[in-house]
Amino acid sequence: MELAYLFGSLAEGKGGALSDIDIGVYLSDTLTKADRGRKRIELIGRLMSLLRSDRVDLVLINDVSPVLKFEIIRPNVLLFERDPDLKVDVEQRIMSVYLDWKYYEDRMNQHLLKRIMEKGLT
């Protein structure tokens, strides 16, 4: 494990009694997808035991969409970092890809709204 973040309702101070514990983990790029999957299962088991809860949702940052990656790092609740330089590199890559995606999503939404305003919903 290289990085771990708390995200979701608990990271935003909005968690309740029924909230799950959302944790995003970044694993080494040298691991295969299958190895990352095995590591995820192992980490979930260890976290459930450590936290004495089965309400643990562990997401592998390596394998999720740019939007979810951004949502994981946005609250900036870092639980673990092996290497501060790697953290900076990973977060910069996530932000770059997310901002590129967001730019095009915003343009598509503007175009869609313009068409709706011009032609209506039919």
Question: For the regions a protein language model found, what residue spans apply to each?
Answer:
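Short hydrophobic/aromatic beta-strand micro-patches
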Residues: 24-26
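Catalytic core of pol beta-like nucleotidyltransferases
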Residues: 2-3, 11-17, 33-122
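Conserved loop-to-beta-strand segment in the C-terminal subdomain of adenylate-forming
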Residues: 20-21
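Structural beta->alpha junctions
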Residues: 28-30
